[in-house]
Amino acid sequence: ETLTLEQVLRAIILRSANEASNGVAEYVDGSVEAFAKHMTERAKELGCTNTNFVNANGLFDENHYTTAHDMALIARELLKHEEYRSMMSETDYEIPPTNLQTETRYLHGQHQMLNPNSIYYYKDAIGGKTGYTVEAGNTLVTYAERDGLTLIVVVMKCNGAEHYTDTAALFDYGFANYASVKIAAVSDYTSTVPVTETYNKKAVALGKVTIAPSEDVYY
């Protein structure tokens, strides 16, 4: 079957399509094994110190592991890329007929904190990914925004609906006790300095250069 990469990524994000994950791995790196190695290397670049991938879909393997902190680092990197940030916020997607499917397929997301009709809906949640295996229980990565502050919550080894209720409790605590504060404004650190060149012990003015940070700094 022929699908676009964007369609396959939606199948992975919304429906945890394991075969789609394997397909992407083979497309990108030639094999699942090579892709898993690639993922592990990239995770280390992001600062992950307790993560090792051996497959592309997250199914159980004793040598396939991570931590809540490492998953948060990976999620933080994803948020920097608008195209993936947008995909993670979607709750529904349609895949039109393909060379092997004659009917449109409708994908509905499983993350209940993004679903306005769910009792677990969290109005500030703007994206995330569910996960489940027998060994790991329910796992959940979610990010939410309020008043300019973005928080990422990762929960693991949850039973029943604990992954939703625990995530909501952590968000409530975070938004109640933390705020995004501007610690440096571009205007405060902008300076115009003269540029000169010395020739035969004489300074010649060449002009002026304005130096400033690229953006305000928040903490």
Q: What are these model-predicted stretches?
A:
Residues C48-T49, N63-Y65, H69-Y219:
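Domain-terminus/edge residues, biased toward the C-terminal soluble/receptor-binding domains
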Residues E1-H69, L73-E82:
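Active-site-adjacent loops and short helices of periplasmic peptidoglycan-processing enzymes
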